[in-house]
Amino acid sequence: MGKNHLQCRECKKEYEPTFKYICDECFGPLDVKYDFPSVNKDTFKDRENTYWRYFELLPIVDKNNIVSIEAGMTPLVKAEKLGKELGLNNLYIKNDSVNPTFSFKDRPAGVAISKAKEFGLKSVGCASTGNLASATAAHAAKAGIPCYIFAPSDIETAKIAQALSYGAEYISVDGTYDEANRIAAQIGDRKGVGIVNINMRSYYVEGSKTLGYEVAEQLDWNTPNHLIVPTG
């Protein structure tokens, strides 16, 4: 297998890197696999202050295909007052709201768009009602690739205004977010559009992992005992 090959999470069948996210044999999800023994903490010393400093742990083969808007290496702030109230001596808050489009979604979107560029895809998109739409549109604009945002027709315009400001096209879908997601998946498969949170998902999720890498590095490679992750 080549660098950063895919492997089925269920049956362990392996695939070369491709525009694929579901196993042909058992329909399980495909994950990216790496040559971990070839890297250590010294690998990342004195590198750029973006999440692309972890290039060896990301699924891009050629650095020329990186689409970066300088996201990542966000502050890890020690919350002393809150920690004291909770009886915790070492409580930290990772502030990803300072990323270029104001959320952690810049991480997965950036990796997915970079892989779409590496695959030579001519257009990208996502099913989203907010932050992911903005992140996908911003990276697509940087890459010079057309971008399509699939969202319910009754969505508040303000929620996708940022994405539209980057030049993305809004595809209005009658129905719920789930319906928008289904339509996006169908168009992605039929037209060869890289839908970052659907048919590019194997690569998309790799970007989110960089937040964890940063936390470890910012703590001098000491992993935290507990993590609290807000969800919406």
Residues covered by each model-derived region:
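PLP-dependent amino-acid enzyme catalytic core
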Residues: 1-232
